[in-house]
């Protein structure tokens, strides 16, 4: 079992009612972090939070809120929405992210079979996030290649997470969260390298 993190640090998981977001929220709540699940529909976020608390037998601090409210309450924000909602979600929480760390899990997969990626003009979803948010937000890309099925278990998982980001400091902070989730994090360099990691997702699927 991981060392418990102080409950002073709050992580918001935007789009946290989806499988990937819920799995990450479960992992961090299990490790002792305070977690706020965000959603376009706050009621769904509240339900997801209740389900996680039940899985952890009530021994966690998890609440549900709108995406904006979740972003406002957290020091670290994790974005787990489908690519179709990527830009709109970021625009909606942009002001709340200033001075914070954003971990972008989004991959620009082409629906419905999601067997290929279509990179945006910015280069990758993470680079697009950086372009939208500007210099006031540290942006990191991570967790794109981890199955939600591995996350919703009560044990460590032998999975590697490649972490790319806008600064060494931001990548180091993100790797701490990777390890808190029971995974192994690797510094994969600057955010421009996120195009490689995002592109790998469709191959693994």
Regions of interest found by a model, annotated:
Residues 106-153:
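Rossmann-fold NAD(P)-binding glycine/threonine-rich loop
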Residues 82-85, 145-146, 167-168:
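Short beta->alpha connector loops
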Residues 50, 91, 127, 131:
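Active-site phosphate/pyrophosphate- and oxyanion-stabilizing loops and adjacent acidic/basic residues
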Residues 132-142, 156-194, 198-203:
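Internal alpha-helical scaffold of NAD(P)-dependent oxidoreductase catalytic cores
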Residues 2-54:
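NAD(P)+-binding Rossmann beta1-loop-alpha1 motif at the extreme N-terminus of oxidoreductases
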Residues 7-10, 99, 158:
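Phosphate-coordination loops involved in phosphoryl transfer and adenosine-cofactor binding
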Residues 56-61, 66-101, 105-113:
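Rossmann-like NAD(P)-binding element
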């Amino acid at each position: 079992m991981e060392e418990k993190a102080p409950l002073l640090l709050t992580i918001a998981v935007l789009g946290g009612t989806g499988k990937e977001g819920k799995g990450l929220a479960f992992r961090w709540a299990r490790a002792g972090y305070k977690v706020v699940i965000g959603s376009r529909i706050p009621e769904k976020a509240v339900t997801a939070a209740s389900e996680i608390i039940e899985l952890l037998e009530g021994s966690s601090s998890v609440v549900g809120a709108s995406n904006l409210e979740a972003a406002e309450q957290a020091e670290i924000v994790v974005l787990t929405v489908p690519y179709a909602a990527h830009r709109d979600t970021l625009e909606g929480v942009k002001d709340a992210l200033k001075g914070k760390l954003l971990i972008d899990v989004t991959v620009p997969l082409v629906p419905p079979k999601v067997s290929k990626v279509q990179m945006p003009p910015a280069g990758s979803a993470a680079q697009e996030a950086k372009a939208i948010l500007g210099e006031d937000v540290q942006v990191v890309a991570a967790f794109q290649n981890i199955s939600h099925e591995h996350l919703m278990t009560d044990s460590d998982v032998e999975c590697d997470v490649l972490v790319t980001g806008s600064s060494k400091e931001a990548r180091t902070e993100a790797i701490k969260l990777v390890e808190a989730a029971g995974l192994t994090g690797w510094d994969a360099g600057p955010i421009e390298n996120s195009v490689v990691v995002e592109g790998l997702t469709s191959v693994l699927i």
